[in-house]
Amino acid sequence: MTKLLVGLGNPGDKYFETKHNVGFMLIDQLAKKQNVTFTHDKIFQADLASFFLNGEKIYLVKPTTFMNESGKAVHALLTYYGLDIDDLLIIYDDLDMEVGKIRLRAKGSAGGHNGIKSIIQHIGTQVFNRVKIGIGRPKNGMSVVHHVLSKFDRDDYIGILQSIDKVDDSVNYYLQEKKFEKTMQRYNG
């Protein structure tokens, strides 16, 4: 069996640790804990790292297509490895949740998130496992684009790091239990 854990974000130093890149931040943490490094794959348009856990190959994926085209990399990997949608877990930011909150879902619309919209368009379904990490709404008249592409202030950054630890725990629990519904019940409380 194989699992794809995909963190959404934008490639490049310019976007490092911005609000829109919390998916990349989580994937980076998982890679660090597993002591694996990423290599760029031009065919899949993604940075990939992998490890084995309980006999399953786990791919850590950071699409390099920029957020709005994330579905290209996800679809290419699912197709190449002949994986089911159940083998996919997407981790991404959510404007409509307060900073640091997490929510696990097994289906849903894009909710205005262009990376999720791209994935839905490319894989042809809204039914896939996902973990949303709250980044909050823009304040003081800031545009949504400026908000998601900005870095966290100090207090929010501390909260996001704590959230990433919780998401890390939930992902590891999911990989051990192999049941996303059970993981949702445990971590959505």
UniProtKB/Swiss-Prot annotation:
One of its GO terms (cellular component) is cytoplasm. It is found in: Cytoplasm. The record marks 93 as: Stabilizes the basic form of H active site to accept a proton. The record marks 10 as: Discriminates between blocked and unblocked aminoacyl-tRNA. TRNA binds at residues 15, 66, 68, 114. The gene is pth. This is Peptidyl-tRNA hydrolase. The keyword Magnesium does not apply. The active site is at 20 (proton acceptor). Belongs to the PTH family. Its EC number is 3.1.1.29. Coiled coil: none annotated. It comes from Streptococcus pneumoniae serotype 2 (strain D39 / NCTC 7466).
